[in-house]
Amino acid sequence: MSQPYLKIAILVAATIVSAIPVWTTPVSTSPPQQTKLHYVGNGTWVHNNTFNVTRYDRITMEPVYNNNLSSTTFFVAISERNFRTVNTPLGASVFWILKSALNPPKHQPCIANVPEPGDPRGPCVNSTVSLFFNDNLEPFLMTKNLLEFEVLPDNYITGWTFERSKTVATKGNPVGVVLSPPRTSPDVNNTIRDDGTPKQHLSIIDEHTTFVLDLQNFTKTLTYISPFAAVWPITAFHAGITVMGCDTTQAIAYLGNGFMGLQISSVNNPPLEMIVAPNDVRARIVNRLPPRRRLEPPGPYAGPIYKVYVLSDGNFYLGHGMSKISREVAAYPEESLDYRYHLSLANLDTLAMLAELSSGKSKDVSYYLYRIIARLAVATFSLAEVIRLSDYMLLQEAIDVDINLRLIVPLVMKYAAGGTADSSYTSSDVAMDQFEVAQAQIEKIVADINIENELRKPMYEHRSLLKSVYAYSRKPLPNAVSFANRLITAMYKEAIKDRITWNSTMREVLFFAVGAAAGSHVILTDGPDLGLHAHKDSSMFLSLNRNILLLCTAMCTASHAVSAGVKLEEVMAGLIAGGVQFSLLEVFSPCMASARFDLAEEEHVLDLLSVIPPRLYTDLNTGLEDDGTTIHSYGRSANGILNSRIAYNFDAVRVFTPELASCSTKLPKVLVVLPLASNRSYVITRTAPNIGLTYSLDGVNIAKPIVISYITYGNCQVSRATIRSVYLDHPGHTQSCVYCGSVFMRYMASGAIMDLIYIDDKDVELQLVAGENSTIPAFNPKLYTPSMNALLMFPNGTVTLMSAFASYSAFKIPSTYLWASIGGLLLAILILYVIVKMLCGGVINNDYSLLLNSE
């Protein structure tokens, strides 16, 4: 290499490493010595002693002399590599950066132009290989990732390029699976055009609002840099970014027109990178080969529209678990351009993850992390592509994506990534730059509503309003929380009387009401910096959310849990049969927003199995399978899913019941939490905690005792009390509600907790004492068996056993037994009569005297 190029190489090396901590090893300044040559491929590695060798940890940068041309080429050598068996100098892995890479970056002409709207060839995606004046390439010379991952082979290996999946798109069907109903066309009356002028007011209540895009405005370029520093940076037109993460994991999807770069990194799991580009674009990995021989990243063969690359820890090891995952997720982008398809499968995978955890089959479900995150990322990519190809976006599409991200990400981060419950986060700005406008609008709409008038509207209107609040409001709105509380209270009144039909609308209304009231765990702060108004709102939010948690717990009766479990069994049967279209909201239940943790216990599982329709036994593969799984595991799965609080993206029980953590005493495993009075809760456990006023129930299976504790905020003392058996006074003659604020609990001698009914008004109180005429099934003693019992928990900490329910036992005597008893009684009377007659007759006639005289 000539002296100018040598100076440039030195300048580039010095410039790049000057931004990082370095140390140098002084060497002799004598002329270059080439007495010791190390041959690497067709090049020679030598020490150039004319300048210091700059080192950064294990990374060494030096020049390479080409044997044929006697010219130097700038390169990076990674020393002391543990995972390579190649016998290179110092055990190093070496790749070249050719001197042509020092030229200024060059791009195709389309980068300076705008794509034609609706043209599939519109995306302009380029792979750049320039170093000079290109700050984006700095990580390639500084990264330590190359020390850890095998992503830079010199030649193709087996499985580097693999066959396309059978589920992906074909030339005859380039867009893949499309779900029903078809995508709605723009409505002229509800269309907002992006023409560069101030946008008109966006109606976020109308789900059919259309946002027409002017792609001429989307000219911002995105430069994608591989986290492995293994693929040269790729440029595309920016479309958005989707972020998902927690305290242990982060996934970022960089979206461009016709492009996606997904990066998944985790403390507990290996990383994975997926790149999607147009099928005529060739991404290039960084290795020592010249450009004409430079490899593409691993992945399947190109499809009719896209080409997919996947880099992971398992690229070199075909038997590796990550190798299987890489091949699976590589098919996702080409299976469908319908974002609903990917959201549906993300929901199904989430359900399968929860079911697997609940069944006890496996405690490690980390492989779901890659599958679910990849599905969600591809869903946002598919939506961005459909918007690009059609030039419009339905507001409903943006809301759907946002809702599913908020619903699924906390679950996958908690169970698959091992993150803490409160640490998850997610965001996406795909083709939607009016979130602030939408948020301001929904706040105004909610502030102006009249709650009494709103409650008179049909349920589908409630769903639209609460759905918008859930999607766009990042903080709880006072009116929305009050409205949600009133709405859930009305649903509770119908649910405890078994008069509610849990169709999809009712399930979604309950979910969005709970989510809109709870917010994103930013509401319950109470510190000295809060103003009076903020303090008042915080207290109201806490009080109403405690009430909602209590009402959902009360709605989760034993009978409802069984019916909800059957619904889940039906869904899992469809999952096994290969069903596609699904949302977790279809199986949402009050139990999933409650404070009941006992539904996975054996008694509740057996109750569920006893009512499963026979048709499901075949679908669920009953009988002993190869792995020993029976229908019983599906029962555990269903009830375990009911125990997941999917309505919250944080630990709602901990946040809404701070009294449970106000002392250092750790509670035993909790079955139920009942937040009654302010800063006071009942906690039901199997073992007595060392805190609170504690009651132990008599007449319960000693293997599964029931312990009730009344815990007050800040009171860390422990005391024991006895449950008294009483007959309740009839409160019908009083206008006041004597038992309001109390909780009625029905339980079995086996230790199973059946129902927990909250007495919130006079009507429920009257039903409590109505006996057999009660319209609330749990209050009807005629439905009780001798093994059932009931008690009442008052808000002041008093617990009483209800004698009227304990002593009521109705026995049905068979008629044959009754008539046989009557016949036996008559026969006994007849025999007794004969005996008495004989005795009396003998005495009167002096027969006994004659008998004695005869002797």
UniProtKB/Swiss-Prot annotation:
- Disordered as annotated region, ranges: 174-195
Q: Which residues lie on this side of the membrane: Virion surface?
A: 20-815
Spell out which residues lie on the membrane's Intravirion side: 837-855
| Subcellular location(s) per record | Virion membrane; Host cell membrane; Host endosome membrane
What's a single GO CC term here?
virion membrane
Cite the InterPro entries for this sequence: Herpes_gH (IPR003493), Herpes_glycoH_C (IPR035305), Herpes_glycoH_C_sf (IPR038172)
GO biological process per UniProt: fusion of virus membrane with host plasma membrane; symbiont entry into host cell
Q: Which domain of life is it from?
A: Viruses
Disulfide links within the chain = none
Keywords in UniProt for this one?
A: Fusion of virus membrane with host cell membrane, Fusion of virus membrane with host membrane, Glycoprotein, Host cell membrane, Host endosome, Host membrane, Membrane, Sialic acid, Signal, Transmembrane, Transmembrane helix, Viral envelope protein, Viral penetration into host cytoplasm, Virion, Virus entry into host cell
Q: How does it sit in the membrane?
A: Single-pass type I membrane protein
Classification via Pfam families: Herpes_glycoH_C, Herpes_glycop_H
Q: Where is the signal peptide?
A: 1-19
Q: Which residues form a coiled coil?
A: none
Sites carrying sugar chains: 42, 48, 52, 68, 126, 189, 217, 503, 679, 773, 796
The post-translation modification note in this UniProt entry reads: N-glycosylated, O-glycosylated, and sialylated.
* Region Interaction with gL: start-end pairs: 247-310
What HAMAP family has UniProt attached to this entry?
HSV_GH (MF_04033)
What does the record note on quaternary structure? Interacts with glycoprotein L (gL); this interaction is necessary for the correct processing and cell surface expression of gH. The heterodimer gH/gL seems to interact with gB trimers during fusion.
Function according to Swiss-Prot or TrEMBL: The heterodimer glycoprotein H-glycoprotein L is required for the fusion of viral and plasma membranes leading to virus entry into the host cell. Following initial binding to host receptor, membrane fusion is mediated by the fusion machinery composed of gB and the heterodimer gH/gL. May also be involved in the fusion between the virion envelope and the outer nuclear membrane during virion morphogenesis.
Which protein, by its recorded name, is this? Envelope glycoprotein H
Q: What is the lineage of its organism?
A: Viruses, Duplodnaviria, Heunggongvirae, Peploviricota, Herviviricetes
